[in-house]
């Protein structure tokens, strides 16, 4: 090794720290000097004569009273006289005179601080030379007290470090010298390959032999060996599935490598290849790894990029290994790497020092054994962090056996400081034991000292032991306090976790029970109960449990959590409420109820009699509600979806509940076994009774509707008996219309049902076929088109305008089962029903409610389908067939075949005053009503009305309407009820009228709704007869006839009106009369078909009815 320059003080200090050089210089340069412990060995060996006797010198220990020769190793914390700031490295003792002066001036206190870092074998050797006694005489002893200082780690935490526990001598905080046997030795094999050329690596045959598996091939050059290993073994096909494994004979690597380059670098250890050569002139160093070459280059450049990570240290190093050694030795003073060879207690701060110790002291054989005994996952590069606790494997060394190993775990913030304190205490405790052993082996030195010195030493030692015991007790108390605090925090955290788990278990239990009852959607959270669309559905739907009102009382979180086995079981299935008396379609319901399977019948409990007497309009759903229980024989439709077909596309699939005749249409295709797939989003469901669709087909003489609904019923109804009841209704509806084709008989229907429900039949493919999808699209579009018409649509009732919240309160009380007598009296009295006229009487709102319900039932049977009126509503010419103009919905000619059902038109020609028109129309109404009611009183009132006051005019109308209303044979009564139903809704006739081209000279066209300002007034006389006072504005909505009236200015009011195309014939009995209202009107006579021989003048302004053939 080259000697460092004398001008560089850092280099000199570093060399002195490594113990390789002394301060003196001779002609040969820097010379090595022996360390303190080596000098002690030499001194101990020279003290003995060959004969076994000791040499007595003039400096006998008995003369100066210093004790035995072991005091040579006594050191003092106070620098001796021969160690000064000007000469810190002078290890030789001064002259004898100075020793005598100093010994007489100060008292000597023996200490064993020098023995704390040395081995016991070296300390037990007796030394009695004159030089040793003189050296020991110049020293003064102190009490071995453990001191601690705080240093700042790189992470900002304070680390406790012991001071005065260094094994070797320290000068100004720096170590001098290295342990024996740690100097670098040359390799065992003298051959060193340079690998500078192709054929320059001439080595012996045994060194150039391939030891891969069972190869044993020999080569002349190193390059040939390396090429052979790379091509034949490393990168050959033997490495299957990229399992890079070294199979060199004697290799202790048992694991595979993650990449090929790692195996290539590893094999260089066996072949001796070192391709990375230093380019520095005159150096010639070679390395097998490139990172080692980069580290070596820094020795030439002087670069030191690895700085010490402690804040108060400015040291820098050329490689990370030296920095780690410095931090472990200087800042932590821990020795976690201990020698595992028996009877060896050496421990070191880094693994490299341990390896050097094993090679130098125990030999290469022990090193190879220790190397092979390492675990498979051991890595030389894994070094412990000096800021953390030592590794677990190091705890087996006696140095690291803490005296309070049973203490509790301390807090996280002080774990590092506590570990370092414990390690320092452990080292001091072990060193004290070793010192006591040394005293027992060499003899007690206390009698050899003067009494004052012995007393002071004993007092200092007792004081030190008391301090150590006090520190240990304090640390144990602190650890116990911290452990108690941590235990309390853990108990609180555990209690919070148990409470949270209890809440979660409650929610999971409730959700599982609700899911088992099919009352909770898996895609939506618990929702509060919502209003039912009508009383019929409300009475059939059981109350839905929610988080606010669950099905049963859930245990509170304050009670301890019960075990899973003691969880409450699911309650009994909810039994739906019985259907009230006289439901809609009693006959059909009875038939469906008779053929229901026994397993679907549930025992029903009798309900309160007050609920059975309540009859509310079934179409009072004014907001989106959850799906109620569908009545038997109902066809369900999805709501929403603007797909150009009014929300009824043909891509949906239907499902039938067996036994009930219920068909449901969903947005997802059905599976092979008929179950409905779950769709995305919220689906509001409304229902059509199958009889409603059949009635609709009969009303419009549409045979295609009959066949389609029967096909859907066959496909979706699994129960044959339910299908047979539907087929009977189909036959009865088929007889009511003129047919062009033969209907299916029951045998054909049964065969088609067997085909659809055969396990081998692919229902999904059939449902997704283009023909069926087109059929479904047209079918549901027609249903939506029919319900879009205002005259036939069952619309929700404006509750706020009719009864001022009475109906809302009634529904709320019925839903919750609380309907007392006081509320019933208030509901029947109906003090304020919303009518703002001065003649308002109690009960008018309820009476109008019931009458309108009866009239509307004739239009469409309980159809609960909300159709949004927009430009994109599914309006097409004819519903079926002619769909070319379906995108031209804004034109007048693009109208459905339903538009001719109620198309009233009022064409006013050269009119001057609307009041004149109304008066003339009133006269015409009077003349029409007078044909059926001929009384003297009415004639007198009519004559007085023509020329009398307004009061007589009003009284005459009242008598006229009163008589006509209670005359069951009167046609005015039938029209009057229709007008009451239509006029209550504010926009009933808005879609019923359209303007046509007026004759020449016409200057205004009036809309029926804008011109008709009808007001209903009711009075209840002593005979409980309802008197309806009504201003009848136009004949189109009352009588349904056409005509023209000419007033005084010869201006004509031309009224043109078409009759409905079919009758409102019903196949099932209706409800019983309620509140003494008249029974529903009989169906009107079917209109006469228009022929070409009819009046052509009247047919010019009347739109022609489209004919639809299928």
From Swiss-Prot:
Residue ranges of the region described as Disordered: 1-103, 170-202, 363-397, 594-682, 875-895, 1057-1110
UniProt keyword DNA-binding present: yes
Subcellular localization(s) per the UniProt record: Cytoplasm; Nucleus
Biased composition (Gly residues): 641-652
Tissue expression pattern: Expressed in intestine and gonads (at protein level).
Zinc finger (C2H2-type) in chain: 208-233, 244-270, 276-300, 306-331, 337-362
Biased composition range(s): Polar residues: 65-90, 669-678, 1057-1066
Transmembrane segment boundaries: none
Cysteines joined through disulfide linkages: none
UniProt key word Cell wall biogenesis/degradation: no
Function in brief: Plays a major role in controlling sexual phenotype. Terminal global regulator in a well-characterized cascade of sex-determining genes. Promotes female development. Interacts with tra-2 to promote spermatogenesis. Promotes spermatogenesis through the Tip60 HAT complex and by regulating the expression of genes, such as fog-3, required for male development. Association with chromatin and at the fog-3 promoter requires wdr-5.1, and may also require wdr-5.2. With trr-1, activates the fog-3 gene to determine sperm/oocyte cell fate.
Similarity remark: Belongs to the GLI C2H2-type zinc-finger protein family.
Listed name of the protein: Sex-determining transformer protein 1
């Amino acid at each position: 090794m080259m000697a460092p320059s004398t001008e560089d003080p850092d280099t000199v200090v570093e060399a002195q720290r490594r113990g390789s050089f002394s301060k003196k210089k001779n002609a040969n340069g820097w010379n090595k000097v022996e360390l303190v412990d080596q000098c002690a060995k030499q001194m101990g060996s020279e003290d003995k004569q060959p004969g076994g006797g000791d040499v007595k010198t003039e400096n006998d220990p008995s003369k100066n009273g210093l004790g035995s020769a072991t005091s040579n190793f006594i050191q003092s914390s106070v620098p001796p006289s021969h160690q000064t700031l000007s000469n810190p490295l002078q290890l030789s003792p001064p002259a004898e005179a100075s020793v005598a002066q100093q010994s007489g001036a100060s008292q000597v206190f023996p200490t064993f601080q020098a023995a704390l870092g040395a081995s016991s074998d070296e300390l037990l050797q007796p030394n009695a030379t004159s030089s040793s006694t003189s050296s020991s005489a110049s020293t003064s002893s102190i009490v071995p007290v453990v001191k601690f200082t705080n240093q700042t780690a790189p992470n900002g935490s304070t680390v406790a470090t012991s001071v005065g526990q260094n094994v070797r001598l320290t000068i100004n905080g720096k170590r001098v010298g290295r342990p024996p046997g740690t100097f670098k030795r040359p390799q065992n094999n003298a051959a060193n390959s340079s690998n500078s050329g192709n054929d320059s690596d001439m080595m012996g045959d045994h060194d150039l032999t391939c030891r891969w598996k069972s190869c044993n091939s020999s080569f002349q050059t190193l390059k040939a060996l390396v090429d052979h290993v790379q091509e034949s073994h490393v990168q050959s096909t033997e490495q299957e599935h990229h399992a890079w494994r070294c199979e060199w004979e004697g290799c202790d690597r048992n694991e595979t490598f993650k990449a090929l380059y790692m195996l290539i670098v590893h094999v260089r250890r066996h072949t001796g290849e070192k391709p990375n050569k230093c380019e520095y002139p005159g150096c010639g160093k070679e390395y097998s790894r490139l990172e080692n070459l980069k580290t070596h280059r820094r020795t030439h450049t002087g670069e030191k990029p690895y700085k010490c990570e402690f804040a108060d240290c400015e040291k820098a190093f050329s490689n990370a290994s030296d920095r780690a050694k410095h931090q472990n030795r200087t800042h932590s003073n821990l020795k976690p790497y201990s020698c595992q060879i028996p009877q060896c207690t050496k421990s070191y701060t880094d693994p490299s020092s341990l390896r050097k110790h094993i090679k130098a002291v125990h030999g290469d054989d022990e090193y190879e054994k220790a190397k092979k005994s390492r675990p498979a996952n051991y890595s030389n590069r894994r070094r412990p962090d000096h800021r953390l606790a030592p590794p677990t494997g190091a705890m087996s060394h006696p140095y690291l056996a803490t005296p309070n190993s049973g203490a509790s775990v301390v807090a996280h913030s002080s774990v590092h400081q506590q570990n370092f304190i414990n390690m320092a205490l452990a080292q001091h405790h072990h060193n004290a034991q070793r010192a006591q052993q040394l005293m027992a082996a060499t003899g007690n030195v206390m009698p050899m000292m003067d009494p004052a010195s012995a007393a002071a030493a004993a007092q200092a030692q007792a004081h030190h032991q008391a301090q150590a015991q006090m520190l240990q007790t304090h640390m144990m108390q602190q650890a116990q306090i911290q452990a108690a605090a941590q235990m309390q925090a853990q108990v609180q955290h555990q209690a919070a976790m148990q409470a949270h788990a209890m809440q979660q278990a409650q929610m999971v239990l409730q959700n599982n029970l609700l899911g088992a009852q099919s009352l909770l959607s898996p895609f939506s959270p618990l929702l509060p109960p919502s209003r039912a669309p009508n009383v019929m559905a409300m009475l059939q739907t059981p109350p839905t449990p929610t988080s606010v009102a669950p099905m049963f009382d859930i245990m509170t979180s304050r009670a301890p959590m019960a075990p899973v086995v003691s969880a409450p079981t699911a309650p009994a299935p909810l039994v739906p409420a019985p259907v009230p008396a006289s439901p809609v379609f009693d006959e059909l319901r009875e038939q469906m109820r008779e053929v229901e399977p026994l397993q679907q019948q549930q025992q029903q409990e009798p309900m309160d009699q007050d609920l059975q007497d309540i009859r509310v309009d079934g179409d009072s759903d004014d907001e989106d509600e959850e799906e109620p229980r569908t009545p038997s024989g109902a066809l369900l439709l999805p709501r929403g979806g603007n797909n150009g077909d009014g929300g009824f596309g043909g891509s949906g699939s239907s499902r039938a509940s067996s036994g009930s005749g219920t068909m449901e249409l969903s947005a997802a295709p059905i599976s092979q076994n008929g179950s409905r797939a779950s769709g995305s989003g919220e689906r509001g469901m409304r229902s059509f009774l199958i009889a409603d669709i059949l009635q609709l087909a009969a009303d419009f003489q549409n045979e295609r509707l009959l066949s389609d609904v029967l096909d859907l019923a066959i496909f979706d109804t699994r129960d044959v008996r339910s299908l047979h009841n539907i087929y009977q209704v189909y036959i009865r509806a088929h007889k009511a219309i003129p047919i062009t084709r033969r209907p299916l008989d029951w045998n054909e229907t049964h065969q088609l049902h067997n085909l659809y429900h055969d396990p081998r039949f692919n229902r999904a493919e059939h449902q997704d076929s283009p023909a069926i999808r087109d059929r479904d699209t047209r079918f549901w579009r027609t249903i939506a088109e029919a319900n879009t018409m205002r005259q036939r649509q069952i619309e929700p009732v404006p509750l706020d305008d009719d009864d001022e919240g009475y109906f809302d309160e009634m529904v709320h009380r019925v839903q919750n089962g609380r309907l007392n007598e006081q509320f019933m009296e208030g509901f029947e009295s109906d003090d304020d029903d919303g009518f703002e006229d001065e003649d308002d009487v109690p009960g008018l709102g309820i009476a109008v409610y019931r009458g309108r319900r009866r009239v509307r039932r004739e239009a469409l049977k309980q159809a609960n389908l909300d159709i949004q009126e927009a430009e994109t509503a599914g309006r097409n010419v004819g519903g079926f067939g002619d769909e070319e103009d379906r995108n031209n919905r804004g034109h007048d000619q693009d109208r459905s075949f339903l538009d001719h059902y109620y198309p009233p038109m009022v064409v006013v020609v050269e009119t001057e005053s609307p009041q004149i028109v109304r008066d003339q129309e009133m006269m015409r109404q009077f003349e029409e009503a007078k044909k059926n009611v001929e009384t003297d009183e009415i004639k007198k009132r009519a004559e007085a009305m023509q020329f009398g006051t307004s009061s007589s005019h009003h009284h005459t109308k009242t008598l006229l309407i009163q008589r006509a209303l209670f005359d069951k044979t009167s046609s005015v009564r039938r029209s009057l009820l229709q007008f009451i139903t239509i006029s209550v809704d504010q926009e009933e006739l808005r879609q019923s009228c359209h303007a046509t081209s007026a004759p020449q000279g016409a200057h205004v066209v009036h809309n029926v709704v804008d011109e008709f300002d009808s007001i209903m007034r009711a009075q209840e006389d002593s005979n409980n007869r309802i008197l309806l006072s009504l201003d009848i504005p136009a004949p189109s909505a009352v009588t349904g006839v056409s005509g023209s009236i000419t007033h005084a200015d010869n201006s004509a009011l031309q009224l043109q009106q078409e009759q409905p195309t079919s009758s409102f014939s019903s196949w099932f009995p209706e409800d019983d009369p309620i509140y003494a209202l008249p029974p529903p009107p009989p169906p009107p006579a079917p209109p006469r078909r228009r022929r070409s021989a009819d009046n052509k003048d009247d047919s010019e302004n009347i739109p022609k009815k489209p004919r639809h053939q299928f």
